[in-house]
Amino acid sequence: MPKQADYTWGAKKNLDTIACLPEDVKQFKDLLYAMHGFTATEEEPTSEVQPGAILKGTVVDISKDFVVVDVGLKSEGVIPMSEFIDSSEGLSVGAEVEVYLDQTEDEEGKVVLSREKATRQRQWEYILAHCEEGSIVKGQITRKVKGGLIVDIGMEAFLPGSQIDNKKIKNLDDYVGKVCEFKILKINVDRRNVVVSRRELLEAERISKKAELIEQITIGERRKGIVKNITDFGVFLDLDGIDGLLHITDMTWKRIRHPSEMVELNQELEVIILSVDKEKGRVALGLKQKEHNPWEDIEKKYPPGKRVRGKIVKLLPYGAFIEIEEGIEGLIHVSEMSWVKNIVDPNEVVNKGDEVEVVVLSIQKDEGKISLGLKQTEHNPWDNIEEKYPIGLRVTAEIKNLTNYGAFVELEPGIEGLIHISDMSWIKKVSHPSELFKKGNTVEAVILSVDKESKKITLGVKQLTPNPWDEIEAMFPVGSDISGIVTKITAFGAFVELQNGIEGLIHVSKLSDKPFAKIEDILSIGDKVSAKVIKLDPDHKKVSLSIKEFLAHGGHAGQDAEEETSSNRD
């Protein structure tokens, strides 16, 4: 019989330690009790109780700081009142409570009990019995800890910072005290801890709400949203759970550089639904579509050639934007700012904020572009340029600039012409205009050509006098004797300046019958020499001379050819 009693007690003990049982399981427990011949309230032998068991006890005394509980062992247990804090209002002598057996006997021979450990054990058993990873539980956020928050779900669970919300968190303290639903992410049986997530539920709710809202949204309807993000290309709005994009081109009919010029974060906007992509969950929004499109009748309102006034609102390297009415801007390109000046920077002509009169040049309605002209409000001096500067007209102009290929002169403010290096002298080979001209000086020249379309005028200085090469054969007939000054010595001969500045060349082979090592042995720059004209080439502006021929025909070295000719006549 004792074995039977021991057996039945052991069974009853095992049943008592089953925690957090649902009602149907408790009924099953009572049935097992009856099968073994005892009731749930029957006294239990104390010899079998081991530390770690949860026992039912009776409150026998209550003081300010302690509660004394009798669990039927050889001594009573004293438990701090702080462990009954959640149930202290209903606590009274004679009340039945569950406690955890820490020790059957301490150093003083007393039983050590814990109400708090019993509660935690029951909570843990409840979690194991009723919950699993993925379960949804309700709890209250109680405090902030390193890396997240603590949530009371019947026991303490950890809510990582990354799982608190699906939006950016500024202050964790704002969440303390909130009662929310959480999803159990992980249950660690060995460590007896639970990790939960609020973000996953919020995200699931958002996705569900987004899908529902996507089905409800219709193109053309008006909706209110909150600005949640501003980018260079547009604004993202929260439409009560679904994000919509308000592109910068759909914000206003006028031109803006950045969306922040019109909106700010957390601002509420009423927008129009432009398009919905249900598969990708994208919604395009419009703000300017709430207003009349000023471009609808733009071609009738601003036909090409019409003069309008507007305000300069933006300057760029290539031109100036002018607002001619609310939402309508046009571009004055730098090439349309002046008839006569080569404008590099719009600031040379206009400033931001200036009010100016312009002429409509063209309209591209589909692209929302208007081309405007500033110079068209003034007379174009090139319209009658051919009448004002006919070919052959002699003019006096100021030299404004010298280049490698010529000199630019100003005929009148904004009207310039070019004297090409080849039109500077009939006889001199000019290497650079600076050999003849200086910037700022005035020069007389002749109009050679006028290109109205290209806005180009060419002038010449040498054309002021007759071309001496036209009379070269009369001036220096082949076979005649001439005199000149040596101006340059080269390896192939010596150049001699003749009448009217014309140069002739004495080739090295035509210098002397006598042998010489180098030309400088018989000639020096500045020497006056006499020679015979042996060849003329007017087309290439060349006169060929020979000292040898001069001497061979009776001339004398060092004798002036003019004197020789005179003596021969005598």
From Swiss-Prot:
Instruction: Spell out the Pfam families in the cross-references.
Output: S1
InterPro entries, from UniProt?
Answer: NA-bd_OB-fold (IPR012340), Ribos_protein_bS1-like (IPR050437), Ribosomal_bS1 (IPR000110), Ribosomal_protein_S1-like (IPR035104), S1_domain (IPR003029)
Q: GO biological process: what's one of them?
A: translation
User: What highest taxon heads this organism's lineage?
Assistant: Bacteria
- GO CC term, one of those recorded: cytosolic small ribosomal subunit
**Keyword annotations from UniProtKB, A to Z:** Repeat, Ribonucleoprotein, Ribosomal protein, RNA-binding
Single Gene Ontology MF annotation: structural constituent of ribosome
> SMART domains recorded for this chain?
S1
Domain S1 motif, first and last residues per copy: 52-116, 134-199, 220-288, 305-375, 392-462, 479-548
Q: What exactly does this protein do?
A: Binds mRNA; thus facilitating recognition of the initiation point. It is needed to translate mRNA with a short Shine-Dalgarno (SD) purine-rich sequence.
Q: NCBIfam families recorded for this chain?
A: PRK06299.1-3, rpsA
Q: Which family does it belong to?
A: Belongs to the bacterial ribosomal protein bS1 family.
What is the designated name of this protein?
A: Small ribosomal subunit protein bS1
Give the organism the record lists.
Chlamydia muridarum (strain MoPn / Nigg)
Q: Gene encoding this polypeptide?
A: rpsA
